[in-house]
Amino acid sequence: MGLQPLEFSDCYLDSPWFRERIRAHEAELERTNKFIKELIKDGKNLIAATKTLSAAQRKFAHSLRDFKFEFIGDAETDDERCIDASLREFSNFLKNLEEQREIMALSVTETLIKPLEKFRKEQLGAVKEEKKKFDKETERNYSLIDKHLNLSAKKKDSHLQEADIQVEQNRQHFYELSLEYVCKLQEIQERKKFEFVEPMLSFFQGMFTFYHQGHELAKDFNHYKMELQINIQNTRNRFEGTRSEVEELMNKIRQNPKDHKRASQFTAEGYLYVQEKRPPPFGSSWVKHYCMYRKAAKKFTMIPFEHRSGGKLGDGEVFFLKECIRRHTDSIDRRFCFDVEAADRPGISLTMQAFSEEERKQWLEVLGGKEALFPSFNRAIIPRPEGSAQLDKMGFTILRKCIRAVETRGINDQGLYRVVGVSSKVQRLLSMLMDVKTCNEVDLENSVDWEVKTITSALKQYLRSLPEPLMTYELHGDFIVPAKSGSPESRVNAIHFLVHKLPEKNKEMLDILVKHLTNVSNHSKQNLMTVANLGVVFGPTLMRPQEETVAAIMDLKFQNIVVEILIENHEKIFRTPPDATLPEPGPLSAPPNAPPRQSKRQGQRTKRPVAVYNLCLELEDGDRPSLPKEDTPPSSLDSLSSPSPTTATALGHPGPDRNHLLTDGGSFGDWAPTAPSQARSSAVQWLNPQSPTTPSCSPAVTPPSPKLPPVPLSLPATVADKPPESIISRKARAVYPCEAEHSSELSFEIGAIFEDVQTSREPGWLEGTLNGKRGLIPQNYVKLL
């Protein structure tokens, strides 16, 4: 039951029950006062917590904005760029959200805290003052009555009458005060219902506004969120394929590390301990150096390096070798030692220690010592035998039979081309298809003997068994270029142009296959094979680099993008000629007039080695790989859906002349740098047809160059590795800005002054020092002083 009403007539009776009702009203107001006081305190704490949360959110957003993903390789996919930008988008979202939260926090003070404080002080405070007056007047009234009633009846009448009048006046005043107090009590009880709740409504309205703004921000963000989810899924799919390829390459190198040494400008390189002699009585010390030797020039370079000291490079030392002599164990108390004598330091020899006897023999062979008995570090590239799959009439028949069967029987099968068949069945089907006698007998469209997954796996295996990928080794790097940069339209234009540069048979088969893949993607709601999924499956199948490296595997994602572009633009690319009004793509090279680097020369091409899943009908028994048994589970055949790329024609330069993988035996000493082959066409001009060409060391647009005549693989030592004859030591000033694209080159702005400028063995390049760092400078970018 609620509070009983206070009747004004009861003010004159002032009964005990009236007083009880007043005390109940007073207690309720006191409880209300304490509640409002506590609520104000909690509200201020809420504001403080909101500000703390907002500061933490802003700090979190700031951290997101400042972080940037690094990537492996020289470019990112569109998906990766969107993922990189997502952190900034998240940061902006939080920033906008916190701006709304700040507005809400300010409104809490104005709409809740201040009105409640005003109500508590002005209204409840006024009642407290009225209560004090009422209590004081009550005490005074009844004290006066007690005193008046104690007057003796023997007093004079005039005195008694005066006392009666005074008491009556006091009682009237008490009644007036009592009436006002009762009125005030009931007024406050009613007023608090809106004076207190109205600020609460305003407070919640502010909260509703904040949450509505958050909802609107989330609604605006939803489209980006959906796109980002697709980007993440595409990147995850590519990662799964890339990881399996990296692990496969790692296992190959783990099993035969010597068969996978990478080509280098140096005939030999590795760690050696070098004896540093000191004056008596200090003896000598052995310091680890990374040594590099070029046999043709007899140039020996050694750089001190200690892994435990933070990996800092010391000052390098260069000399020209005169002779190398093996140290006998009775002449030194260390094993695996040999002496080298420098031609430019008469009478001075250095004692070096290899890590093992085998390494010492290898160094002695390369350096011209007496124990040249074992194979050296480097290995020549020997092509391995290929499978019997060919791009001929039989190949087109196989392709068309498989495609007809897939489109007739399994166009809606989930995971089409991703689900792999049993290896033995796939090999048997492909063998029958490639045999002229049995090919016509194979009925793929009606026979239940061949599952759809077996047919799709056979189709992919045929394409991977070709001596050269369908999109050719020669154009592999050119197809990768537009996938790494430019707008979507410019990418399509560049790939459109490059497809029409393919050999006619390659283009015809690619047309048939891509048309089929377009049909498959049109049924993606049923088979779940979107364009992105088909790109993951067929990217490594249609495009393979020549060398099997981690850099090549990192380019898998760009191969997938090229295949996606082919599928999405099949009609335009294969049914129309390239736009003649657009400039022909030029080679991806250094800027106009910039000298080429020897370290950027391409090595001689070799055929792709046969992988374990390639068709091996013509291999000798001793070389025949073992095939999985009939009951091999599909999970063991994942390589059928994600074939291993065997190379990468890398566009970046991770190290000097280290972009070629050596796979077979040969003499390291006989190896020499190769001359540049025909300049590769690229799609740079397609990507930025309007951009001006500014001098830069970075790749830029140049006019298409004529084909260069082939140059023999091995160059004479006098040409390839001749030490510099004319050495200058002058200053030079930069006349163009340059951005280095390799760690051995210098970046600089116009007007930079170089010290100690000398000629370099790299034709068209100089060596100089800028700000304490020494490196290569394009000769036509500077003016000698």
UniProtKB/Swiss-Prot annotation:
Residues 265-372 form the PH domain. Residues 633-650 have a biased composition (Low complexity). Residues 598-608 have a biased composition (Basic residues). The keyword Cell membrane applies. GO terms for cellular component: cytosol; endosome membrane; perinuclear region of cytoplasm; plasma membrane. Its main location: cytoplasm. Residues 389-574 form the Rho-GAP domain. Residues 584-595 have a biased composition (Pro residues). Residues 675-697 have a biased composition (Polar residues). Residues 7-262 form the BAR domain. SMART domains: PH, RhoGAP, SH3. Residues 576-708 are annotated as: Disordered. The record marks R418 as: Arginine finger. It holds the Pfam family SH3_9. Residues 727-785 form the SH3 domain. It comes from the Eukaryota. InterPro entries: AH/BAR_dom_sf (IPR027267), BAR_dom (IPR004148), GRAF2_SH3 (IPR035485), GRAF_fam (IPR047234), PH-like_dom_sf (IPR011993), PH_domain (IPR001849), PH_GRAF (IPR047225), Rho_GTPase_activation_prot (IPR008936). Residues 622-632 have a biased composition (Basic and acidic residues). One of its GO terms (molecular function) is GTPase activator activity. GO terms for biological process: cytoskeleton organization; negative regulation of apoptotic process; signal transduction. CDD domains: BAR-PH_GRAF_family (cd01249), BAR_GRAF2 (cd07635), RhoGAP_Graf (cd04374), SH3_GRAF2 (cd12065). GTPase-activating protein that catalyzes the conversion of active GTP-bound Rho GTPases to their inactive GDP-bound form, thus suppressing various Rho GTPase-mediated cellular processes. Also converts Cdc42 to an inactive GDP-bound state. Essential for PTKB2 regulation of cytoskeletal organization via Rho family GTPases. Inhibits PAK2 proteolytic fragment PAK-2p34 kinase activity and changes its localization from the nucleus to the perinuclear region. Stabilizes PAK-2p34 thereby increasing stimulation of cell death. PANTHER family: OLIGOPHRENIN 1 (PTHR12552), RHO GTPASE-ACTIVATING PROTEIN 10 (PTHR12552:SF5). Interacts with PKN3. Interacts with caspase-activated PAK2 proteolytic fragment PAK-2p34; the interaction does not affect ARHGAP10 GTPase activation activity towards RHOA and CDC42. Interacts via its SH3 domain with PTK2/FAK1. Interacts with PTK2B/PYK2; the interaction negatively regulates ARHGAP10 GTPase-activating activity. Interacts with MICAL1 and WDR44; complex formation might transit from GRAF2/ARHGAP10-MICAL1 to GRAF2/ARHGAP10-WDR44 complexes. The BAR domain is important to associate RAB8A (or RAB8B) and RAB10 to endosomal membrane to promote tubule extension. The BAR domain is also important to recruit WDR44 to endosomal tubules. This is Rho GTPase-activating protein 10.
